[in-house]
Amino acid sequence: PLCVCLQLTDRRMNFLARANVFKNPVFNKMLRAMGLLPAYRMGHEGLSAVNKNFETFEDAGNSLRDGETVMLYQEAGHQDKRWLGTFKLGYLRIAFAAAEKMNFEQDIMILPSCNHYSNYFHARTDMVIKFGKPISLKPYYEKYQASQRETMMEINKVVREEIKDMMLHIEDI
């Protein structure tokens, strides 16, 4: 994420990070000041903690509304393979919540990106960052208001295909 952040320097960057690093009140304050927001995961923090994501989504939506960037990876994890994992819908929930707060008057853009590492396990190896074409959510606003989940699933497919086209994707490994 830091390498991508360094490529996008024209605005404040916000990131979602594992919630467990926010447990210490001092670290919590420091991380939030740096633009990190806690992401609660079912497999790690449990169902009751996952509901705290609504506050994170609210904070991320406020950042988007204020013209900042929220960066997250839809796969919500790391892997050392050459294939694209399953995407979660949280990034679209954040984006549409921000659009809703702005009465669907401002456009929210999704910028697909992918990272290629020459050696996933070793730092200081070659890395390539690719950015795709920004995807505007504005054409989907009306459809979203009528059918939220179906619209998010449709956009998720578009974003996933855009990222898949930018990377080395080998499904049968």
Model-predicted regions and their roles:
Residues P1-E150:
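Soluble catalytic domains of membrane acyltransferases
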Residues R149-M153, K157-I173:
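Long, charge-rich alpha-helical interaction segments
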